[in-house]
C-alpha cells in the first residue's frame, strides 16, 4: 500500500489568517522556526466533529507562545472558531488537529 505524502493531500489549512489549499501551505525557507526551532504546537483530538477540551488546548498553546516570547495573534474565541472551521472544511468528524505557531522570517538573528 502506497502512502500519500503529507505535502500532496486534498484539503485546506488555516495559515496567516486565511484558508489555503493544503498543497500551497508552505512556510518560507528563511522562517525563524526552520532555522532555530522557534515553534510551538498543540495536538488535539476531535470526536463527533468537536475538539476535546479545545479551550484548554488553546490556552496551553498561548502559554507556550509566551514562553518563546511571541504572541498568538488571535483571541481564544477566534482560535477555537478557526479550529472548528478547519474541521468542517476538511469534513473531519473524528480525527486529529495540530495547531502550531512559529516565528516568521522578520528576524533571523539569535537574541537574548
Task: Locate predicted features.
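Conserved alpha/beta cores of soluble small-molecule-handling proteins
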Residues: 1-112
Amino acid at each position: 500500500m502506497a502512502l500519500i505524502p503529507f505535502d500532496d493531500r486534498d484539503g485546506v489549512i488555516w495559515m496567516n489568517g486565511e484558508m489555503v489549499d493544503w498543497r500551497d501551505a508552505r512556510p518560507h525557507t528563511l522562517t525563524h522556526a526552520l532555522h532555530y526551532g522557534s515553534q510551538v504546537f498543540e495536538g488535539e483530538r476531535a470526536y463527533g466533529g468537536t475538539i476535546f477540551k479545545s479551550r484548554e488546548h488553546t490556552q496551553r498553546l498561548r502559554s507556550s507562545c509566551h514562553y518563546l516570547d511571541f504572541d498568538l495573534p488571535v483571541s481564544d474565541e477566534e482560535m477555537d472558531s478557526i479550529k472548528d472551521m478547519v474541521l468542517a472544511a476538511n469534513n473531519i468528524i473524528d480525527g486529529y488537529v495540530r495547531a502550531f505557531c512559529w516565528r516568521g522570517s522578520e528576524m533571523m538573528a539569535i537574541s537574548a
